[in-house]
């Protein structure tokens, strides 16, 4: 096994691979957009099951392979459960994640984009802020970042 690295990031996308594994696209502050495989993440009782949910934000423990990374553990700080409970918020969050995936680059620092995504998700959960306003601010700021 190669050296383990720890990085702060957010799961943008999760897709099943085989019977028990998941392929994740993470946006990390120091490595940009990366692809990681969570082996056994679909098994009941797996420690990686919750960490491989879309919108999960935290510190991920990974090992680098030739083409991708393998996920070995995570300390999730925020699951953004409120986004999944409101269909409109979930749609906006998915839209923001798609933007981040499109504009994110592998191997390039993405701290500003990660911060923007995190703050936008938090803003979606505040009923006082209209979601349309959050969307417009997100779109403007992501264009400035890139």
Where are these regions (language model features)?
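Non-catalytic alpha-helical scaffolds and adjoining flexible linkers that form interface surfaces
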Residues: 1-23, 27-146
């Amino acid at each position: 096994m190669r050296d383990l690295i720890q990085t702060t990031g957010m799961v943008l996308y999760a897709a099943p691979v085989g019977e028990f594994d998941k392929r994740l696209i993470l946006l990390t502050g120091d490595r940009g957009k990366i692809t990681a495989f969570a082996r056994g993440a679909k098994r009941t009782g797996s420690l990686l099951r919750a960490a491989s949910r879309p919108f999960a934000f935290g510190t991920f423990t990974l090992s680098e392979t030739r083409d991708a990374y393998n996920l070995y553990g995570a300390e999730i700080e925020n699951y953004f459960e409120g986004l999944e409970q409101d269909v409109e918020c979930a749609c906006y969050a998915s839209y923001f994640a798609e933007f981040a995936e499109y504009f994110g680059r592998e191997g390039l620092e993405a701290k500003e984009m990660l911060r923007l995504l995190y703050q936008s998700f938090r803003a979606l959960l505040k009923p006082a802020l209209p979601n349309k306003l959050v969307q417009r601010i997100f779109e403007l700021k992501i264009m400035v970042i890139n």
